Amino acid sequence: LTPFLKQASLYISKNFNIRFDPEISSKDLSTRIFLATSGYQAYVMQLIHQSCLNTMNNNRLVVSMSDFHAAYASKNILYKPMTQKNIFQLNPSQITEILI
């Protein structure tokens, strides 16, 4: 998933001048994206797309964790989550517990 996320980030940065903080391919965010989508690329792209739209609608150029939370919580995107918890609001230790 990480190489896919790196390419998506490069494409979005180059074509839309939008970046991610934390970086989308970081261990933390990529793990959350995987847990939210089970790694299905179509679902990953829907999540990224909606997160970027949230950012642009708020006149910002940096996609934050809160944008992913809003996109995930909107429930208008198809997912196959690995947990029923909102993965983008959990702290890192809670993420680790889900992975165990």
What residue ranges belong to the model's regions?
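C-terminal alpha-helical "lid" subdomain
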Residues: 2-100
